[in-house]
Amino acid sequence: MRDALVVGAGPAGLTAAATLKQYGVEPLVIEAERVMATVYSYAWKPVENYPGFDGKRAIEIARAFEEMQKFFGVEVVEKERVVKAWKEGDKIVLGTQSGNEYEGKVLIIAIGILGKPRRLGIPNEDAPNVHYIVKDPTAFAGSKVVVVGGGDTAVDTATVLAESGAQVTIVHRRDQFRAPMRSIERMVRAGVKMVLNSVPKEIIAKDGKATALVVTHKEGGETVLPLDHLVISIGFEPPDLEWVKSLGVNMRGKEILVDDKMRTNVKGVFAAGDITPAPKRILVAAAQGYIAGFTAFRYIRTGVW
C-alpha cells in the first residue's frame, strides 16, 4: 500500500506528488494518458499568466513540470485509467480499466476537467480535415481555416494559425469573445476575420472532405465559408466522474468541492486543480497541488483531519 495515490499527472497532480516527496512521503501518480497530456496538446499556446514564463510557449511549462517530476523521483503510471474507487477501513482502493488495483492511505484527485472534445452535432464532423486540437499550426500555412468557438483556446488557435500563414476566419455564436482582451487584440492584429452572432448549421463535404461551413446568423440569413480545414474549439466534455461520485465526495455540477486546505468532505480524500471550482489556470492548479500535498502529508503523519 502506498502512502498516497494521486490521480492525474498535470500541474496539480505533479506538484502534489513532488510536495509529498519533499516531506518523505511516497506517492504514486496514476495518469490516464501521459504526463502533462493536456498542456502538450496545446504545446504552441502562448503563456501569459504564469510568472517566469510570460510570452513563452506551453511546451516549456510542460517540460519544466516533467523535469520537476524526475528531479524528485515521482513515480507515474501512464495509460492507466481509473474507473472505480472505494474505501476499505482507513485505506482507499482504486480500480483501473486494465484490471489493476492500487491502495493508498490518502487520495488526491487532480484529473482536470477535460474529457473528449465537444462536437457540433452536425453531419460530416468526422471528415479528415475537421480538427478538434491543433498540434502543429505550421502545417496549416497557406490554407483557408475556419475556427469555431469563442473561448481562450479558440481565440489563441485562430491567432497562431494566422501568424503561421493561414487565412483564418473565426465563427462565434455570441457578439463578444470570452478570451482576455490582450488575446483578442493579438488576434485582430494577426488579421483573423470574425463572424459573430452566428451558429454552424452544416458542413459541406465533397469526396469525404469538408469544403465549406454554412453558418446561420442570429439576425437572419446564412453564409457559406469555404475552407481547407475546419477547427472546432467549443470546449470539452467532462471526464468520467462516476468513480469520484462513488466515494461520496460533495460536488457542484462537474466540480469537486474542497476547503482552503484542499480537503473534500470525505476523510483522506483531497482534490486540486481544474476539477475544483477555482480559476482554470496552470498557476492556480500548481498552487492547489502544493496545498493538497502538504495537507495530505500532515494528515498521514498526525492522523488529524
UniProtKB/Swiss-Prot annotation:
Binds 1 FAD per subunit. It comes from the Archaea. Its cofactor is FAD. SUPFAM superfamilies: FAD/NAD(P)-binding domain (SSF51905). FAD binds at residues 31, 42, 82, 274. Keywords: FAD, Flavoprotein, NADP, Oxidoreductase. Its EC number is 1.18.1.2. GO terms for molecular function: ferredoxin-NADP+ reductase activity; flavin adenine dinucleotide binding; NADP binding. Pfam families: Pyr_redox_2. This is Ferredoxin--NADP reductase. Gene3D superfamilies: FAD/NAD(P)-binding domain. It comes from Ignicoccus hospitalis (strain KIN4/I / DSM 18386 / JCM 14125). It catalyses: 2 reduced [2Fe-2S]-[ferredoxin] + NADP(+) + H(+) = 2 oxidized [2Fe-2S]-[ferredoxin] + NADPH. Belongs to the ferredoxin--NADP reductase type 2 family. Homodimer.
